[in-house]
Amino acid sequence: MLNHAQIRKFYDAFGQKQDKQFYEAAALQSLIHHGGFATARSVVEFGCGTGRLAATLLAEYVPDTCQYTGMDISQTMIELCKKNTEKFKDRVTCIQSDGSPKLPMQDQSADRFIATYVLDLLSEDDAQTLMDEAHRVLLPGGLILLACLTYGTTPVSRLVQSLWSGLYALSPKIVGGCRPISLAPLVNPGIWQTVYSQTIISYGVPSEVLVARKTTS
């Protein structure tokens, strides 16, 4: 598993190439479709990358009054996010994090929390901490929207997943530190209500998309 410094170094170098991760598009579109963004007032994205998703949401899906806060460990990604959301700069805040899953936000300050292809990069402890932090930051009834690499459900996707896992075992750097995981065990049914969960296969790569509503404060 890559440590925070290794993750930062990799994604600082990876930069704009992040937007060429073709297998992510179908999962992200599904996440948008089930995210209820038409009523969003404050969106937080952990692992904002180049800001491509943010720019799409701000241009097409959220109200003109919606505020967006994006965080990323990579300085390169933060600079790209600022550039790609320049048109909406009055409503956008981009924060470079130190890699900690602790969030610099007040309790109950957002109604949408997004983490796409991030939890599959984190340790189990950091992933659970991020889930707890998302719960703290979200308003009651707010939605957490997640997407990650996951386990295959068809012969082809199982083969791709097996190859990916093999490369990760050989050297996590080869696959950017990401490996297939399952999101469901991270979602505590005592404080979250899962409203959508689906495995989406694109070009043989399996992704899990999950949307859950905060049910308790």
Identify the function of each model-found stretch.
Residues 1-38, 52, 56:
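Conserved class I S-adenosyl-L-methionine
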Residues 42, 141-143:
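Short glycine-centered segments of the SAM/dcSAM-binding site in methyltransferase folds
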Residues 44-101:
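Class I SAM-dependent methyltransferase SAM/SAH-binding core
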Residues 103-113:
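A short acidic, Gly/Pro-enriched loop at the edge of an enzyme's catalytic core
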Residues 112-125:
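A short SAM/SAH-binding and catalytic strip from SAM-dependent methyltransferases
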Residues 128-140:
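A short glycine-rich, Lys/Arg-flanked "PGG" loop and its adjoining helix->strand segment in the class I
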Residues 147-190:
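C-terminal alpha-helical "lid/dimerization" subdomain adjacent to the S-adenosyl-L-methionine
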Residues 199-217:
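Core SAM-dependent methyltransferase catalytic element
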